[in-house]
Every structure is written in C-alpha cells, then in structure tokens.
Amino acid sequence: MSPSESFNSFSLFSTLSMFKFLTQITFSRPFVYSALNKGCPDFLITSNCIHGNSWPHLSNLFEVKNFLMPSEDPPQLQNCKVIFLHGNTNAPTPLRPMEFRAIAFTTISPYIRVCVST
C-alpha cells in the first residue's frame, strides 16, 4: 500500500488482526499524515513511549485535536484499534524524517500500536 492510497482503517485492522503474534509493518510519514488528516476515529495517540518534552511537538506535528493519553496499556486500550507512539525520546524540533512501524498485539486485544522508528 503506497502513501498516496486512501487510508482504510477497517481493511488495515482486519488484515493485521489475523495475526496471533507480534507483527511489524512500516509506513511512511505521508501515509500517516493522510490517515490522521482524515480524522479517523480509530486513531489514538498515547504518551507511553513519548518523552515529556517531545509530546507537544508530536501533537502539533500531526495536528491532532482529539487524543487520549492513557497511563498504561490494556485494559485501558482494549477498545482501541490504532495507537501512535513516538519511539525516539531524543527527537529534535521539528521531528526529523522517520518511518512508522505498526505493531499489532492481537493476543491481548485487536488494536495496532504504531511507533516511530529512527
């Protein structure tokens, strides 16, 4: 799936939820921008792996207005499908070009954890 293709959260969710083990998929930033700009309700940004000083930069970068910041993983996240995490705790402002890795944890609950990789 290319970054220019329209984002279909249900299709992506259905594909990844078939796995019963940890799965990683790489997305480009434009792909993620497109998904977030469409206001997909299945997206959630969490601070679980975001350094405190990096969180404001990340939220501004994606222009996400409605987000949750749960303090822990399940059960708080058991109803979430997609979660964005910033995996680089030393990112400068603005964040340098990175790839996004989606990790599906379907043994606990059907949601996708998306992390930024440097």
Curated annotation (Swiss-Prot):
Give yes or no: UniProt keyword Mitochondrion.
yes
Which portions of this protein are annotated as coiled-coil regions?
A: none
Keywords of this entry: Mitochondrion
Q: What happens when the gene is disrupted?
A: Has a respiratory growth defect. Shows partial growth on nonfermentable carbon source.
Q: Name one GO cellular component term.
A: mitochondrion
Indicate where this protein is primarily found. mitochondrion
Q: Does the keyword Transmembrane apply?
A: no
- State where the protein is found: Mitochondrion
Task: Relay the record's extra comment.
Answer: Although initially predicted to be a dubious gene because of an almost complete overlap with MRPL51, it shows transcript and protein level expression.
The free-text function statement in the UniProt record for this protein reads: Essential for the functional mitochondria and respiratory growth.
Official protein name in the record: Mitochondrial protein YPR099C
